Amino acid sequence: GIDACNAALPNIHAAIGSDPIMNDKIRIGVISFSDTAQVLLPLSKMTDVVDFPGLVAKGGTNYGNAFTCLKNTIQTDMVDLQKSGAKMCRPIVFFISDGEPTDTNWKAAHAQVADKTWPFSPHIISFGLSGAQADTIREVATQVDKKGKSFAYLADDDASGAVLREIFNSLLSPILRDECLEGR
């Protein structure tokens, strides 16, 4: 699971980096979580990222800490982008987990991030690897397509890297086009 994600991230980076429109619009950051959550890659332009930090499976799966860290990071990053005069788009988060939450308060932290009254509330597209349950992954996703289908996905270990790349490429372009290029 995590190894496939680590293998997929450089390919996704290369795909975005080769598209001048996406490269201009996208900033990427990486937050890792287990028992705690930490920013591994601060929000950066794609052209400024040389190597992705490796994700490591360890400890528990504390979703609450992940969502709290995510909200704080988005808040800081979006304010910094506003100050720099950069065109702002609603953030898009790919939430990737290889397990079920080990904390009981994660839904409250998730609700704060997903709150549509928060001006920086992100689209959350969730991706579950081998240890994650479909119902939980669906509950994490906030983004839905025009037919109301949740952008929540599951993959087994063998297919996770390919599925992650496919999902990233098929979803990110339409969301960016709708929200950033057409000014939504």
Language-model segment annotations:
Residues 1-25:
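…and closely analogous acidic/polar surface helices at protein-protein or active-site interfaces
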Residues 3, 99-143:
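VWA/integrin I-like adhesion module and closely mimicked acidic/polar interface patches used
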Residues 24-53, 134-143:
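Short beta-strand-loop
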Residues 27-32, 90-97, 125-128:
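Extended hydrophobic secondary-structure segments that form protein cores and membrane-embedded regions
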Residues 38, 48-89, 123-136, 160-166:
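Von Willebrand factor
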Residues 50-51, 126-184:
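Von Willebrand factor A/integrin I-like adhesion domains
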Residues 67-119:
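Exposed acidic/Ser/Thr-rich ligand/metal-binding surfaces
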Residues 89-90, 120-123, 147-149:
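Short glycine-/polar-rich loops that comprise or flank the Walker A/P-loop
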